[in-house]
Regions:
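Mg2+-dependent endonuclease catalytic cores in nucleic-acid-processing enzymes, primarily RNase H-like
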Residues: 1-82, 112-115, 124-139
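Short, solvent-exposed helix-loop connector elements
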Residues: 81-93
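P-loop NTPase catalytic cores that bind/hydrolyze ATP
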Residues: 92-112
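Hydrophobic helices that insert into or interface with lipid environments
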Residues: 119-120
Length: 139
């Protein structure tokens, strides 16, 4: 999809332009991409770059939240030369609101400019190395 004039494009999201109907702007995003992104952050080991962690040591304090996060599953699907994880609700497990909210919050952070170096535009500074020029190259 090509951006329309006035839109702000981002990583698998775009913010509508200022000329939107009734002056209301919205953010549209690829739900499958971002749910996969959040799931990868949760699977990343605590303390590693890009991990998403939760406060406390007692998992029962987050039982309802984690229940919502397990309310969907993904199926890898191939199309247009790539593989995409397509997320779907689990049967008999309708409550996924907090999973959707967590995903939306991560998208909102991206819209605000927060990024991991592996997916964002932020570059990692490389250490400069001093090298000696060969004798046959004039200095």
């Amino acid at each position: 999809r090509k951006p329309v004039k006035g839109e702000k494009p981002g990583t698998e999201w775009y913010l509508s332009g200022h000329g939107a109907k009734r002056g209301i702007r919205f953010c549209a995003y690829d739900t499958n991409y971002w749910k996969t992104f959040v799931a990868q952050r949760i699977k990343t080991a605590t303390g590693d770059i890009g991990s998403l962690t939760f406060w406390g040591h007692d998992a029962t304090e987050h039982a309802t939240f984690f229940s919502h996060m397990r309310a969907e599953y993904f199926t890898p699907t191939a199309g247009r030369g790539r593989v995409v994880d397509v997320w779907q609700p689990r049967p008999q497990h309708p409550d996924n609101h907090w999973w959707d909210c967590l995903t939306g919050a991560v998208v909102a952070a991206s819209v605000a400019g927060v990024a991991l170096t592996e997916v964002g535009t932020t570059s990692v500074k490389k250490e400069k190395k001093m090298v000696a020029l060969p004798a046959y190259i004039p200095q």
